C-alpha cells in the first residue's frame, strides 16, 4: 500500500471532504448560531432584577425628604415624640408623604434621640467618675502624709519615754537622802563648856546636849502645841 492509502485509512476526513456530507455541515453551523443566541439572550429574572433596581432608585429618590419637610417633621417631633395613627395620616397628607414613611421617620428619630440621651448620660457619669477618682487620689495622698506624721509622733514619744525612764532611774539613788523640812529642821549640837561659861550656864547642864531648832520648825511646833492645848503649860514652865 502506498502512503496516501495509509493516510486515508488512518484519517477518513481526508478521504471524504466536507462537501460529501452537506447535512452535517449545516447542522454544525446551526448549533453554533443557537449557542450564540443563548449567550445573547437575557434571562427574565435578571431583567426583572434590573428593572427592580432602577425602580428602587426612583423610589429612593421619591422617599428623600426636602429641607422643608424635614424641618416640619422636626418641629412635630419636638411637640410629640410618638404619634397616633390619625396624626400620622394628617402629617403625611400635609407633607405629601406616605403615612408609613412618616411612621418610619419618627421611629428612627426616636432611636437617635434615645442614643443622644444615652451619650449625654454617659458623659455625665464619666465626669463624675473622674471627679471621684481624683478625690480618691487626694485622700490617699493625705492619708500617706498623716501616716508619716503619726510615725514621727510615735518616734518622738518613744524618745521622751526613754529620757523620762533614764531620769527616774538616776534620781532614785540620790532621793533617799532627802527628808521632810520638819525632820531636817532639828539638829543636835554638842555642848561647849567655854561658851556655856560665858553665858552663866550651870555646871550640871555641861554634859547635856543642846537641840537646835530653826524658826520655821519652831513656829510649826508652837502651832501644833496650841492646837493640842499645851501653850499654857509651856508658858507656865518658862515663867
From Swiss-Prot:
Keyword set includes Aminoacyl-tRNA synthetase: no
Coiled-coil positions: 107-168
Tissue expression as described in the entry: Expressed in seedlings, roots, stems, leaf sheaths and panicles.
Short name of any one Pfam family annotated for the protein: Homeodomain
Subcellular location: Nucleus
Region called Disordered, residue ranges: 25-65
DNA-binding region: 58-117
A GO biological process held by the record: positive regulation of DNA-templated transcription
An annotated GO cellular component: nucleus
Keywords: Coiled coil, DNA-binding, Homeobox, Nucleus, Transcription, Transcription regulation
Cell membrane in keyword set: no
SMART domains: HOX
GO molecular function: DNA-binding transcription factor activity, RNA polymerase II-specific; sequence-specific DNA binding
Stated role: Probable transcription factor.
Family: Belongs to the HD-ZIP homeobox family. Class I subfamily.
Protein's recorded name: Homeobox-leucine zipper protein HOX12
Species: Oryza sativa subsp. japonica (Rice)
Recorded name of the encoding gene: HOX12
Amino acid at each position: 500500500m502506498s502512503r496516501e492509502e495509509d493516510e486515508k485509512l488512518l484519517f477518513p476526513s481526508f478521504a471524504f471532504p466536507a462537501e460529501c456530507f452537506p447535512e452535517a455541515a449545516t447542522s454544525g453551523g446551526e448549533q453554533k448560531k443557537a449557542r450564540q443566541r443563548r449567550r445573547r439572550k437575557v434571562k427574565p429574572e435578571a431583567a426583572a432584577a434590573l428593572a427592580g433596581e432602577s425602580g428602587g432608585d426612583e423610589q429612593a429618590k421619591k422617599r428623600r425628604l426636602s429641607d422643608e419637610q424635614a424641618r416640619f417633621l422636626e418641629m412635630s417631633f419636638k411637640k410629640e415624640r410618638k404619634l397616633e395613627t390619625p396624626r400620622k395620616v394628617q402629617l403625611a397628607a400635609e407633607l405629601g408623604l406616605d403615612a408609613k414613611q412618616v411612621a418610619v421617620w419618627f421611629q428612627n428619630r426616636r432611636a437617635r434621640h434615645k442614643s443622644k440621651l444615652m451619650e449625654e448620660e454617659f458623659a455625665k457619669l464619666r465626669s463624675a467618675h473622674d471627679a471621684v477618682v481624683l478625690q480618691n487620689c487626694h485622700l490617699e495622698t493625705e492619708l500617706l502624709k498623716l501616716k508619716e506624721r503619726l510615725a514621727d509622733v510615735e518616734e518622738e514619744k518613744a524618745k521622751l519615754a526613754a529620757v523620762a525612764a533614764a531620769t527616774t532611774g538616776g534620781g532614785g539613788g540620790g532621793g533617799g537622802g532627802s527628808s521632810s523640812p520638819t525632820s531636817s529642821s532639828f539638829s543636835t549640837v554638842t555642848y561647849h563648856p567655854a561658851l556655856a561659861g560665858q553665858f552663866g550656864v550651870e555646871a550640871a547642864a555641861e554634859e547635856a546636849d543642846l537641840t537646835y531648832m530653826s524658826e520655821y520648825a519652831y513656829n510649826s511646833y508652837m502651832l501644833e502645841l496650841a492646837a493640842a492645848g499645851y501653850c499654857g503649860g509651856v508658858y507656865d514652865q518658862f515663867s
